[in-house]
């Protein structure tokens, strides 16, 4: 049983267990009340950066908040697809769930890195620590995925040619 699980699958499942509920709640708070959700603790650095450096109107700020929520929900969707793929043994053994995990890690890393840069620009140390921690978790799982060996295909059993008799029909391709 333990031979079926890859270390990147376990690491990805643990990362998904954190990001799916956390980023879903943050995104739904933004969807319900865009401005109020944007100025909550996980997004305060993005909100302050947008208001200080961009000088956007109210509706443009709402659109930026929705764009952030859409990005986070996209990461959540890829993590959910990854977890669904993990339930199937064929995908898990062959490493087929790696594409969904790679997409979630790459998009999530970009969002966390941008949020971390914005937090450093506006001087939010708590938000900086949060986004740096999220980025390190995502990059750690990405490094595990990159350094892990590819999945080895199961050996195929070949039948001996002596089983063929003269009474068995032969295909036209076997001439």
Regions found by a protein language model. Name each.
Residues 107-175:
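Alpha-helical transmembrane segments of multi-pass integral membrane proteins
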Residues 11-19, 68, 101-111:
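Hydrophobic alpha-helical transmembrane segments of polytopic
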Residues 2-3, 78-106:
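Cytoplasmic juxtamembrane regions at transmembrane-helix boundaries
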Residues 5-36:
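N-terminal signal-anchor transmembrane alpha helix
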Residues 32-60:
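Membrane-interface interhelical connector segments
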């Amino acid at each position: 049983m333990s031979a079926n699980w890859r270390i990147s699958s376990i690491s990805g499942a643990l990362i998904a267990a954190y990001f799916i509920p956390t980023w879903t709640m943050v995104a739904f708070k933004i969807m319900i009340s865009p401005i109020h959700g944007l100025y909550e603790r996980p997004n305060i650095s993005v909100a302050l950066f947008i208001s200080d450096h961009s000088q956007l109107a109210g509706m443009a700020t709402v659109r930026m908040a929705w764009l952030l929520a859409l990005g986070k929900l996209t990461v959540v969707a890829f993590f959910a697809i990854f977890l669904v793929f993990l339930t199937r043994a064929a995908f898990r053994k062959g490493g087929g769930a790696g594409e969904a995990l790679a997409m979630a890690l790459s998009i999530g890393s970009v969002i966390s890195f941008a949020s971390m840069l914005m937090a450093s620009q506006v001087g939010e140390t708590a938000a900086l620590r949060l986004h740096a921690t999220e980025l390190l978790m995502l990059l750690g799982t990405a490094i595990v995925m990159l350094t892990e060996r590819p999945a080895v295909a199961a050996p195929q059993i070949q039948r001996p040619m002596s089983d063929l008799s003269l009474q068995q029909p032969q295909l036209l391709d076997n001439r």
